[in-house]
Regions:
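His/Glu-rich zincin catalytic helix
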Residues: 1-67, 91, 104
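Acidic/histidine-enriched segments that form metal/cofactor-coordinating
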Residues: 61, 68-176
Length: 176
């Protein structure tokens, strides 16, 4: 990629790519994109990327979910994530002076999640509710029909949330 005067691209020795753009704002936006989405799932794993996205917010080997949320929100930040067909992204808006803390916590969430069965089962129920809500939204369903038509036979035709059937069969200790 070509650098411009405000955006810088770095590749670390471990292959992780970093994009940095300086702005004079006191607020910084940070994100980590993991190259795993619906397109990487086998039919029986459909919904796994989205399930893992939810589960990593339930704590790490070193910090509880409550500690992570309080650490970010306690300094005025917000943290969230989303899953697409191509990737899963974890991101935050934070005062610039707290970027290092935020990146550390996001990295810990991704690299050292603690999948406790009780918590992952709660997330399974949350996602089952999401699926129910999604299935009550005609505009979402027509979009799924379109993707099924265009991407028939491909993992890209699979819904990001998974299905009730596949979600019930995913392990409560997901591996990734």
């Amino acid at each position: 990629m070509q650098e411009n005067s405000q955006t810088f691209y770095h590749i670390l020795s471990n292959g992780i790519k970093i994009v940095h753009r300086w702005t004079p704002s006191p607020v910084a936006y940070v994100g980590v994109m993991v190259g795993a989405g619906t397109r990487d799932e086998k039919p029986e794993e459909n919904g796994m990327a989205h399930y893992i996205e939810h589960c990593v917010f339930k704590g790490t080997a070193h910090h509880s979910a409550r500690h992570i949320i309080h650490a970010i929100e306690g300094v005025g930040g917000e943290i969230n994530a989303y899953t697409t067909k191509e990737e899963t992204t974890f991101y935050a808006a934070i005062l610039a002076e707290h970027v290092q803390l935020t990146l550390h916590l996001i990295a810990e969430m991704i690299l050292e999640p603690c999948f406790k069965k009780e918590e992952t089962e709660k997330e399974r129920m949350v996602i089952l509710d999401e699926i129910e809500s999604y299935n009550d939204t005609p505009s979402e369903l027509i979009y799924d029909d379109f993707e099924n038509l265009v991407f028939a036979g491909s993992s890209l035709a699979q819904p990001i949330l998974g299905t009730r059937k596949t979600l019930r069969h995913l392990s409560s200790k997901p591996e990734y």
